[in-house]
């Protein structure tokens, strides 16, 4: 148990560092990033509170009859995504305790879930939400439920499977790691399964999942027409726009069907391992991670900036799976290498070289150390890249501020040239080209609204 905890904590920390690659997407939205971080922390605190009182059998004390409903209410009130998750995770814990462990549940647990539902309703039905929708997203507000799903579903699925766009440390990287780890561990655990039909089913599904991951990896090599066809099977098009322009086309649904099948099979693995290990936390965290992303299918804004809670839950799943593999001596390093290769072939080669080199030095039961080293190497690499890009953009930012102040002080005409950032996704947005940002800049510095802002590329 101690080994499991140590392994999980180390890997969770390394993945947190690695995640700077995707965190860059939200860093310049400081208020939003802070909100997502705090609401995620609130959700995890509430989940642990419930888990400790229900599964860990921590004695319910008098203060819990006040604190637990209050925490549940405020967790339900945090935001649409975490609000739904607070209810969903609470229900899963109740199902596990009542129907799997067949244990009595204290009434305060039901009361807490009721308060979470009330908090969720306060959040969702608040008049301000409707006003914001009408003002900020008027077109989206006019869609019915089916149209909203058709408009947003490609972003939700793309964030889980589009490894080309989001890179190392992005959500697809963690999703594919989960798919692979779940498949291998399920296969190995099923070898001791007494139910032969279940054993064969799990093994067949595990093999199919591994083949899928390997085909995705091969598609990154662009070896021939047939592989390119498979590569396009993970290309998610906007369903609503496609329907409006061309009518119903079943072919665009193929990527969604494939991706849905992959997620459902992975959920089967997560539930199976949870039952075999008699630990509900793995299944609940994994299914909740997918639900957290799925909720965004009816979101008016891009789900990119709200992936933090999904990634956070997947970190826990990966760390827990790695600790199981460590204690049961199950080899999972190969999947890690393949997943690095899926993101970038060069990453795959580097991780393979590190894996082979360390395997020749360390004993075979130390594979988990190798995995930690590989993740650590790329985590440091990501931080160095982001820090360098941030410094470059920072110098441009201060140069633009200097130009604006000089323009205001000298009243130099009706055109103001501002430098374009090196890369928009590293901490700073451009000042030119987005009307609301231009208006904010002019208003803050007292620039005449008639002044034209012109973007100047760095030579």
Protein language model features and the residues they cover:
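Transmembrane catalytic cores of multi-pass membrane glycosyltransferases
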Residues: 1, 63, 80-88, 95-270, ...
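Intrinsically disordered, polar/acidic, low-complexity terminal segments
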Residues: 1-7, 104-113, 226, 333-334, ...
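Short hydrophobic alpha-helices at membrane interfaces in multi-pass membrane enzymes
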Residues: 52-73, 110-111, 329-337
